[in-house]
């Protein structure tokens, strides 16, 4: 993967994790309004709703973002080692 693709997928992964983490969990998450906790319609999918796909998608995006960040750090380390070969050596 080239540098542009690594950066792009890293940003997509980070933004996707932020979006999944910021998503409201439903009417029960609103504690300011007592009537908001009442069910207004039946659940869309009775076997867990959209929570499982959101969690799995968020984990996949998080793994993708971490992999891209590790790739960026690996490439940065190689460039620093090539430019400054004596920077990591300590004098006794």
Swiss-Prot record:
Subcellular location: Host Golgi apparatus membrane; Host endoplasmic reticulum membrane; Host endosome membrane
Keywords: Glycoprotein, Host endoplasmic reticulum, Host endosome, Host Golgi apparatus, Host membrane, Membrane, Signal, Transmembrane, Transmembrane helix
Cleaved signal peptide residues: 1-22
Extracellular topological segments: 23-49
The keyword Lyase is assigned to this record: no
Keyword Nucleotide-binding in annotation: no
Membrane topology, from the record: Single-pass type I membrane protein
TM spans (from-to): 50-70
GO CC, one annotated term: host cell endosome membrane
Glycan-carrying positions: 33
Topology feature Cytoplasmic, residues: 71-92
Changes seen on gene knockout: Knockout mutant significantly impairs plaque and syncytia formation and decreases virus production.
Chain's role: Functions as an activator of viral protein expression and virus production. In turn, promotes cell-to-cell spread as well as syncytia formation.
Similarity field: Belongs to the alphaherpesvirinae glycoprotein J family.
Protein name (Swiss-Prot/TrEMBL): Envelope glycoprotein J
Gene: gJ
